[in-house]
């Protein structure tokens, strides 16, 4: 197996194909990683969540990272890492249009709301949960691909 970097175009294509990734944030030098449903646009990533540890931590430290991948097997995979800044879209006077845009994009993924609400079993609890739409303003994107030995180009 060989691991090679992929182009920005290939990174963008993967982020458009997949809708689940892992969001990393940190507080007081302690990292925290959770799965999230997301929707990608060239300059940002939209995510929906309920209020909890990750939102509290990102409010304190807005530097975040998102990792998404496609895995065939241990020697055939592609991974993309996005770094950026957390921006909450729940301030009505500033972000109503962006929040609605995020909702429309995320609604294209039929499971977009399930991850944040998966812990809630009771309908009353779900309706009382504070929800948060946010975006990651992208600072950098990079990616790697693992190529199985049999697929490596032969040089003469």
Spans of features found by a protein language model:
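Short beta-strand segments
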Residues: 18-50, 66-67
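Charged, gly/pro-rich active-site loop segments
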Residues: 77-156
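Extreme N-terminal tail/first-helix region
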Residues: 1-17, 89, 154-156
